[in-house]
Amino acid sequence: MPHPVQLGKKVRMSYSQINEVLDMPNLIELQKEAYDWFLDEGLREVFNDISPIQDYTGNLILEFVDYSLDENPKYDVGESKERDATYAAPLKVKVRLINKETGEVKEQEVFMGDFPLMTDTGTFIINGAERVIVSQLVRSPGVYYNRQFDKTGKQLYSATVIPNRGAWLEYETDSNDVVSVRVDRTRKQPATVLLRALGYGTDQQIKDLLGEDERILATLEKDNTKTAEEGLLEIYKKLRPGEPPTIESATSLINTLFFDAKRYDLAKVGRYKFSKKLSLANRIMSHKAAENVSDPQTGEILVEEGTKIDREISLLIQNSGINEVHVYSEENKKIKVIGNHFVDIKTHIDFDIQDLKLRERVYYPVLREILDTFDSEAEIKEALKERKRELIPKHILKSDIVASINYAFNLAHEIGNVDDIDHLGNRRLRSVGELLQNQFRIGLSRMERVVKERMTIQDVDLVTPQALINIRPVAASIKEFFGSSQLSQFMDQTNPLAELTHKRRLSALGPGGLSRERAGFEVRDVHHSHYGRMCPIETPEGPNIGLINSLSSYARINEYGFIESPYRKVDKKRDVVTTDIEYLTADEEDLFIIAQANEPLDEEGKFGNKRVTSRTKFGGIDVVPFDEVDYMDVSPKQVVSVATAMIPFLENDDANRALMGSNMQRQAVPLLITDAPIIGTGMEYKAAKDSGVVVVARNSGIVDYVASNEIVVKLEDGQKDRYKLLKFKRSNQGTCINQKPIVSKGERIEAGDVIADGPSTDRGEIALGRNCLVGFMAWEGYNFEDAILINEKLVKEDALTTIHIEEYESEARDTKLGPEEITRDIPNVGEDSLKDLDERGVIRIGAEVESGDILVGKVTPKGETELTAEERLLRAIFGEKAREVRDTSLKVPHGENGIIVDIKVFTRENGDELPPGVNELVRVYIAKKKKINVGDKMAGRHGNKGVISRILPQEDMPFLEDGTPLEIVLNPLGVPSRMNIGQILEVHLGLAAKALGWKVATPVFDGANEFDIMDALEESGYPRGGKLKLQDGRTGEAFDNPVTVGYMYMLKLHHLVDDKIHARSTGPYSLVTQQPLGGKAQFGGQRFGEMEVWALEAYGAAHTLQEILTVKSDDVVGRVKTYECIVKGENIPEPGVPESFKVLIKELQSLCLDVKVLTDDDHELEIKETIDDDAGEMSLEHGDFDYGLEEPTVPEGSHITDEEEKDEDNDSEEALITEEDFEPTSVETEYAEDDDEFDGYNDFKA
């Protein structure tokens, strides 16, 4: 039975059976924690890596001592958006310069540029635009082995050693058992050459090192080198072909390639993966010892020959400092296993070393040396601190290389295992912090070069740290990262869910990641290790499928960047599932048996069933005895992401449709009247609260004052908290951001309560759409092919009305002929057009504007022409006033209208920062109410999308027996083949819940079932089947069969017909071909392609065809004359020669072919090169043929993205035939014909 649960201010009836033992984490914590780590530790790491910088003589030393970020940025978040500024704080670094000769030390605080700050909601504001840094999924550094088969079916093994940065090492075996190695992607050579270069010079040394394996012998036979020196030279020749090889240069090359921390970096995660993969313990575990193994310090026998080594003994052997053990293989051969000599420091030191942060395994030879040299605790601690870099080296060691080669040999004897690179144990996340750190490191290393150069040039006695440091490269690399990296994205702000999901997105694309073209099926596929870490459902359809994913709802990121999922621990002694939570990474999870969250437990927490369905080791699924289970899931929704967890009855939907449902919820536009879903999943409150669009109380207290734009809360200590609310602001996507209070004066609130709603929220819950009364039936074919029939009532009541705000800007610049001026005094414009402009020429707030209306009056000086005597006289009498200017006012673009809601004016005089050459900048915001319309796209939450085909009067809609008309009629044929049955269950339960006055929570995989719904229907007085009798609104007669009717949550999506519909009579033309441009953004025409031409040819419609190919397209003279004839009412003249024909001739002539055009009787036809002069005059007479008769420019600064704006500059001015155009001045860019090109743009205001 459903039970009430309190979610914020609302109570929902929940059908959940499972007690949640763990609250969901903060959903944007992954962004915030990563950035905080960067500020606290990431920056320090980079400075420590680069410091100290020495000059080439070793005399001057520059050290970075400390850094601080000023907590008071120049502009706050709101101001930064308004002024197109970056929300950033100055980074100051304390730098010390030491002169070794004189012993002089200079310290200075150096400003290192403004550093972008993260807002409270996990975003950055760069140049006034809100951006998100998406986390990147990359292959983790480590050692990877894989297995292939040759033609004869023989197993061949290969391995790759991948660092975080530095040279790769690759091993492979061939059919003849020869093991070869590639160093840094060069040609391959026998692996023994590398071993010789590392100092194992003779054949005997190599055999002693790795044992007498047949692979070793085969490789030695292939190897032409015989000594360490020859090995070095051989490797040098491969890496530096063409350079004279010497022993010194070869030795230094090997050292810088692998053993220099500046060139080769494993990072923390790489060292962790190396120690895990190559550790002795993991490899000898569960094999039989082939000899007695004794502790080298005490001589105690740890394991006897023939005994099977278990986990405990294997760790004991490893931690005692033993690095080589012989074990028996499956075929009872003696196999030598070599580890990489890393041990757990806690087994050797009994005092507390917490503060040294030596959490990982350490290199045993160094540790042994320290323990043998020092005795007292203090000395050992000091030595450990000093030699931390040697204990946990960042670069690869000889022992790592030897162990990795040995591992490859052991694989042939079934010792060790091969890796799956798509396993989430081998893929890690680079989140904001690390991406920024890498970028900062690039900037600092560029700066280091400059510093070294300046050290040599400048006077040693007078030099200061400030004079040495050039911050340009650092500032540039940060700016470049935020401004143009693939992972820095313009935030999707359509609604709160879109915002939240964007911050939790994981992308495998980007620098250092995959590319769409190269990514195969395997990378994109759902993997068993995704469980509880990455959502198997939410991913885009199309070329990015499986490359862009979403973090699961309970997942978190550990210090190494691996995704962890929480589980409840099972107490094996008492066989009780405890409430203790443990977070496991994907490779840890593979070793355990884990029960599902919906497994029944009794009061004490014991399993109800003797046999339990579980996920077994390495991704299998099986039914196991209850006493074998190690862990249990915390919640059924830990598998899926936030958006997917908001689909009720997800378990009854086909995965493909659930994917569409998850993605379409992100495209829902915020409605004017919000309405939380009747059938929710209980996720709505948490998602809204964490998305950052609602206002959350910082402290407890009593509400003191409430207005539409401010809430004041009085705290216990008499202090007051003020909360400013956002009113009608424009989001990145042009939707409307508006907050409204949901508390009243005198109300008591607690810290963390939601006190004001934002867009698409209803009393603190996400409300993306509206609950509509839906019937599934065919109606006169109007819902054929997923079309949707809606009731006119939805239009009248503004139920699906949305507000959209567009931004237009106009700037007055300095031109060669003088400055542009924003003014009301515009030539040749009637008073009627200026009625809404104020005295400075800017439109007033509240004015209603239509397409073509002037928003900002602006004039630009015209080129000086040779003046006639009369004009010179006038100029002499009236002064400069008579100088010619032309009208370049900002007008409302074609097809747009609305009400002016805001105006912002920035001028140099007021001290506003403007780009160079700009004197004044005006921004105008136009708001428009868009009612639901035929052609708009709507969808439910189950991937059931459709387009509105007809809006029917209320009286014609089918109605229930009590007279209630349906609001929406859907096609029942949309359900069976799509297999999204969740929508049907939602409709039935919605009907019952509405009647009972409930709001329901039915969590995913743990919600209401068929019988619960039938019970609810019965309780509310409806038949258990849920089908009702309907009558036809037109005739009043009952339909033959009862119909499924109920409440479904419907969303209005961002694909609105008003933004897509487009028409043109005349407009801009491409400069070279003189054909109309394409796409709505360019005010282009409809392409009449070759297939359409064939259709007209087939009909023999010769005149229509000729007209389309000439005067309607690129017959320049003809189209001007045609236009003139239409205006004057004369007959249309004969078409001329299309421009594209002339272009073809020119192209052939450029290929040195003399092309002539002949008539039937072999006379040469003269094809004019330019447009004849009368065409030019005509064009001026008839105000360049455009929509309307004004100058045909796409209005300046209309709501365009940056990319479009660049294009626009070409077209709006040059691509039109205007008076200047008879001498073309610049080359135009060809345009994408399809408007979709401009649909998903990243519109970053540069």
Curated annotation (Swiss-Prot):
What GO cellular component is one of the record's annotations?
DNA-directed RNA polymerase complex
A Pfam family that this protein carries is: RNA_pol_Rpb2_1
Keyword Transferase belongs to the record:
yes
Write out the entry's keywords from A to Z: DNA-directed RNA polymerase, Nucleotidyltransferase, Transcription, Transferase
One Gene Ontology term from the biological process aspect of the record: DNA-templated transcription
Name the record gives this protein: DNA-directed RNA polymerase subunit beta
What is the purpose of this protein?
DNA-dependent RNA polymerase catalyzes the transcription of DNA into RNA using the four ribonucleoside triphosphates as substrates.
Entry similarity comment? Belongs to the RNA polymerase beta chain family.
InterPro entries in UniProt: DNA-dir_RNA_pol_bsu_ext_1_sf, DNA-dir_RNA_pol_bsu_external_1, DNA-dir_RNA_pol_su2, DNA-dir_RNAP_su2_dom, DNA-dir_RNAP_su2_hyb_sf, RNA_pol_bsu_bac, RNA_pol_bsu_CS, RNA_pol_bsu_protrusion
What is the reaction catalyzed? Answer: RNA(n) + a ribonucleoside 5'-triphosphate = RNA(n+1) + diphosphate
Subunit-structure text: The RNAP catalytic core consists of 2 alpha, 1 beta, 1 beta' and 1 omega subunit. When a sigma factor is associated with the core the holoenzyme is formed, which can initiate transcription.
Q: Composition bias, kind Acidic residues: at what positions?
A: 1202-1223, 1230-1240
| Organism from which the protein derives | Alkaliphilus metalliredigens (strain QYMF)
Lineage of source species: Bacteria, Bacillati, Bacillota, Clostridia, Peptostreptococcales
Taxonomy, superkingdom: Bacteria
Gene Ontology MF term list: DNA binding; DNA-directed RNA polymerase activity; ribonucleoside binding
Q: Which NCBIfam families match?
A: PRK00405.1 (NF001616), rpoB (TIGR02013)
- Region annotation Disordered: where it falls in the sequence: 1171-1246
Q: What is its EC number?
A: 2.7.7.6
